[in-house]
Amino acid sequence: MFSSSIRLIVSGFHRTQPLKSPVNSPSVFISVPKFFNSESKSTGTGSRSVAMSSVEKTGSDSGAIENRASRMREKLQKELEPVELVIEDVSYQHAGHAGMKGRTDDETHFNVKIVSKGFEGMNLVKRHRLVYHLLREELDTGLHALSIVSKTPSESPSKD
């Protein structure tokens, strides 16, 4: 059933720590199976469901800069190929909070729900570390808070 797998080096996930070279830091190796054709990107049809709470792109030309939610979706979709992926921008709930004063970016807080066979055999900590690893660039460039729900298809209620 699994066509290929990837090996990820997962280390140093606290967002204020700099990324360390795998040679110089302890690492955990996680094998994540790929089990869907990466070319198919259906949204909300069949067994795969992708939900977004914000606009895919800003601007109208094909070279427009994607927003943070869209970049997060692409990274998670590419590596985990989830059967369900919900990304919700809840930054508006934190506007005016002390930590947000003076910030120019407005996409800082997200809720993410991922249902993927790639999580099978992983405990909750390893699942979250994997998601943080995949979103490292976003965490380093303004993503302030991330709430993660990570499940396997057998742990998630059926949508029949």
UniProtKB/Swiss-Prot annotation:
Q: SUPFAM superfamilies this protein is in?
A: BolA-like
Q: Does the keyword Disulfide bond apply?
A: no
Any one GO MF term held by the record is: 2 iron, 2 sulfur cluster binding
Give the matching Pfam families.
BolA
Locations listed in the record:
Plastid, Chloroplast
Q: Under the cellular component aspect of Gene Ontology, which terms does the record hold?
A: chloroplast
| Record keyword Iron present | yes
Q: What keywords does the record list, in alphabetical order?
A: 2Fe-2S, Chloroplast, Iron, Iron-sulfur, Metal-binding, Plastid, Transit peptide
**Which residues constitute the organelle targeting sequence?**
1-50
Polar residues bias: where? 39-61
Highest taxon of source:
Eukaryota
Q: Where is this region: Disordered?
A: 39-66
Q: Where is the signal peptide?
A: none
**Note in the entry:** The GRXS14-BOLA1 apo-heterodimer model derived from NMR data shows a domain arrangement totally different from the holo-heterodimer showing evidence for a Rieske-type ligation of a [2Fe-2S] cluster.
Assigned protein family: Belongs to the bolA/yrbA family.
This chain's function reads: May act either alone or in interaction with glutaredoxin as a redox-regulated transcriptional regulator, or as a factor regulating Fe-S cluster biogenesis. The glutaredoxin-BOLA1 heterodimers bind a labile, oxygen sensitive iron-sulfur cluster.
Query: What interactions and quaternary structure are annotated?
Result: Interacts in vitro with GRXS14, GRXS15, GRXS16 and GRXS17, but not with GRXC5. Interacts in vivo only with GRXS14 and GRXS16.
PANTHER family given in the database record: PROTEIN BOLA1, CHLOROPLASTIC, PTHR46230
What this protein is called in its record is Protein BOLA1, chloroplastic
Give the gene that encodes this protein.
BOLA1
